[in-house]
Amino acid sequence: MGTAAEALNNIDGTPCKEFYVADIERQGEQAMLWDILQEADEDRYVCTMSIDSNARSNEDTIKEFGLCDFHSYTLMQSVSVKLHPNGKKRRYLLQLRNPWGKKEWLGPWSDYSKTWETYPYVHE
């Protein structure tokens, strides 16, 4: 089984990079990951994301939130939002598309999540 990066490269020669969040977190470089995603989004790169097939320890959480393992999602946009108009606290949100269209994110910040009501300023 290959990766989305390998598929894109095989189809049209698109240069691809792969990043593993677990590796970045171990290095304490979470801000670097956000910078990479922002730059890729701004430059209109094709970005895909997937859940590591070795994430068995998180299998229940994956299913609870409506995600699929062994499956690629497309990054539609990445945004950094303030939780309150005058506050400094931010959240980094990713809008992903499931090409299958059969399952949907059910966790915080999902389409019908109460989180939007808790932080109405973000929706604006």
PLM-predicted stretches and their roles:
Residues 1-124:
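Accessory/interaction modules and long regulatory regions
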